[in-house]
Amino acid sequence: MADIIIKNAYVLTMDPDAGDIKKGTVVIEDGKITEIGVKTKESADTVIDAKGSVVMPGLVNTHTHAAMTLFRGYADDLQLAEWLEKHIWPAEAQLTAEDVYRGSLLACLEMIRSGTTSFADMYFFMDETAKAVEASGLRASLSHGLIELWNEEKGENDLKEGKRFVRAWQGAAKGRIKTMYGPHAPNTCSDEFLAKVKEAARQDGAGLHIHVLETEAELLAMKERYGKCSVHMLDDIGFFGPDVLAAHCVWLSDGDIEVLREKGVNVSHNPISNMKLASGTAPVYKMLERGVNVSLGTDGCASNNNLDLFEEMKTAALLHKLSTCNPTALPARQVLQMATVNGAKALGTETGMLKTGMKADMIIVDMKKPHLTPCFDVPSHLVYSAGGSDVRTTIVDGKILMQDYRVMVLDEQKVIEEAQKAAEELVARVNS
C-alpha cells in the first residue's frame, strides 16, 4: 500500500521526457514518487482528490537569509549605504540565537504556505536555522556566513565555525539538510581566505555559497584591489566549479559569463531584491542562452520583502522581457524550470521534477480562483497569474506539511506571535 495518492490533477512534471498529464495521478511511498500516470491500481493511506488543481514540483529558493524575516519592512526606500550602515548592520549586531530561530521558523512557515519546499540559506547562528528546518519538515542547504574582512584572526575563527557547522549538520533531518561553506563575497573576504575556504569545502565534500557582483561598488572595489573583477579573481584562485552557488551575478561582462559557463557555476538570480536595492539587472537572458544554470532566489525579507517564489517568477519573466526589449525572452515554462529543475540542480538534490524514483517534494496549486479563470495555458497561469497564496497543499520527502491550506507541522499562530515579539524586542535593543 502506498502512503499518498494524488488523483484527478493536472500533473506538471517538468520532466521533458514525460510532459504534462492533463488528468493524472501521482503515487508516493517511503518519501519517493513510485508512479505517475493517468490511473493507478494502488491504494493508499491518504488519497487527495486534486480536481481543478495542478500538482507540480515544489519550488526551490536558491538564495535567502531566513532569519531576516524579522527585518521585514524595518528599513525601506533608502540608499544602500544608509540602509546597511544605519539600519541592517546595527540590528544584526543585536541578534541572538533565539532571534534567529524565531525568524527562521517564521520563514519556514511562510515558505510552506507559498509552495517552496527547498531553500539555500547563508546567515549567522545557523544551528538555529537548522533546528527550524528540522521542525518544519522542509529541505535546505545551509551555510554559516564567513566574513573575514582581511582580518586573519577573524577569518580563522569564522572558518573554524563554518567547518563545525558543516560537519555537525550534514545529512541531518533524515537527509533533508545539506551543508555548504558560505564565504560572504569577494569584497568582504580576501583571495587567500577564499582559497582556504575552497580547500576546506573540497576536504568535506561540501558546496560553496557566495555573493558575486551584486553591486557596481563591488566591481569597482575589486578592480582597484586586484586589477580584475570578482569572477576572474575567483577563477584565478581555482574557486569555481559545479559545487559553487553564486548569488546575484548582476555586474557580469560577456567574458564573465563564459567563465561561469566553462566552470559549471550555478547562479541564483534575485530580481526583486536587485530591483528594490537598485543593484542593477543581471544578464540572465544571456546566461541562459549560453548554458549557465540559472535558478531563482528571493534574498532576505529585508530586501524583498517576502519569500514568495511565484512573485519572483513573474518578476523575472517581466524584467528580462523589458530589459531585452524582447517579449519572447524567459517564457513561462523556462521560468518554471528556473524555479524547479535548475534550483534542484544548483543544490544537488533529487528534486525539481515529478519523476518515478525521485524524492516526493511537490505542491498542489488550486486553480479554481477568479484570477486563474479561464485557464488556456497552465504554465502561463502559474507564472503570470498565480501567487503563493494559491498553494493548497505542500509535500516534502513524502510528508504532508500543509493540506488544504492547513499547516500540519507547526503551530502557526505561536510561530507568528513569537516572531513578532522577537522582532519588537530586537528593535528595542537597537534603539536603547
UniProtKB/Swiss-Prot annotation:
<protein>
    <recommendedName>
        <fullName>5'-deoxyadenosine deaminase</fullName>
        <ecNumber>3.5.4.41</ecNumber>
        <ecNumber>3.5.4.31</ecNumber>
        <ecNumber>3.5.4.4</ecNumber>
        <ecNumber>3.5.4.28</ecNumber>
    </recommendedName>
</protein>
<dbReference type="GO" id="GO:0046872">
    <property type="term" value="F:metal ion binding"/>
</dbReference>
<dbReference type="GO" id="GO:0004000">
    <property type="term" value="F:adenosine deaminase activity"/>
</dbReference>
<dbReference type="GO" id="GO:0090613">
    <property type="term" value="F:5'-deoxyadenosine deaminase activity"/>
</dbReference>
<feature type="binding site">
    <location>
        <position position="63"/>
    </location>
    <ligand>
        <name>Zn(2+)</name>
    </ligand>
</feature>
<dbReference type="InterPro" id="IPR023512">
    <property type="entry name" value="Deaminase_MtaD/DadD"/>
</dbReference>
<keyword id="KW-0378">Hydrolase</keyword>
<keyword id="KW-0479">Metal-binding</keyword>
<dbReference type="GO" id="GO:0090614">
    <property type="term" value="F:5'-methylthioadenosine deaminase activity"/>
</dbReference>
<dbReference type="GO" id="GO:0050270">
    <property type="term" value="F:S-adenosylhomocysteine deaminase activity"/>
</dbReference>
<comment type="function">
    <text>Catalyzes the deamination of three SAM-derived enzymatic products, namely 5'-deoxyadenosine, S-adenosyl-L-homocysteine, and 5'-methylthioadenosine, to produce the inosine analogs. Can also deaminate adenosine. The preferred substrate for this enzyme is 5'-deoxyadenosine, but all these substrates are efficiently deaminated. Likely functions in a S-adenosyl-L-methionine (SAM) recycling pathway from S-adenosyl-L-homocysteine (SAH) produced from SAM-dependent methylation reactions.</text>
</comment>
<dbReference type="InterPro" id="IPR032466">
    <property type="entry name" value="Metal_Hydrolase"/>
</dbReference>
<dbReference type="InterPro" id="IPR011059">
    <property type="entry name" value="Metal-dep_hydrolase_composite"/>
</dbReference>
<dbReference type="Pfam" id="PF01979">
    <property type="entry name" value="Amidohydro_1"/>
</dbReference>
<dbReference type="GO" id="GO:0006556">
    <property type="term" value="P:S-adenosylmethionine biosynthetic process"/>
</dbReference>
<comment type="similarity">
    <text>Belongs to the metallo-dependent hydrolases superfamily. MTA/SAH deaminase family.</text>
</comment>
<feature type="binding site">
    <location>
        <position position="299"/>
    </location>
    <ligand>
        <name>Zn(2+)</name>
    </ligand>
</feature>
<dbReference type="InterPro" id="IPR050287">
    <property type="entry name" value="MTA/SAH_deaminase"/>
</dbReference>
<feature type="binding site">
    <location>
        <position position="65"/>
    </location>
    <ligand>
        <name>Zn(2+)</name>
    </ligand>
</feature>
<feature type="binding site">
    <location>
        <position position="211"/>
    </location>
    <ligand>
        <name>Zn(2+)</name>
    </ligand>
</feature>
<comment type="subunit">
    <text>Homotetramer.</text>
</comment>
<dbReference type="InterPro" id="IPR006680">
    <property type="entry name" value="Amidohydro-rel"/>
</dbReference>
<keyword id="KW-0862">Zinc</keyword>
<comment type="pathway">
    <text>Amino-acid biosynthesis; S-adenosyl-L-methionine biosynthesis.</text>
</comment>
<feature type="binding site">
    <location>
        <position position="92"/>
    </location>
    <ligand>
        <name>substrate</name>
    </ligand>
</feature>
<feature type="binding site">
    <location>
        <position position="214"/>
    </location>
    <ligand>
        <name>substrate</name>
    </ligand>
</feature>
<feature type="binding site">
    <location>
        <position position="184"/>
    </location>
    <ligand>
        <name>substrate</name>
    </ligand>
</feature>
<feature type="binding site">
    <location>
        <position position="299"/>
    </location>
    <ligand>
        <name>substrate</name>
    </ligand>
</feature>
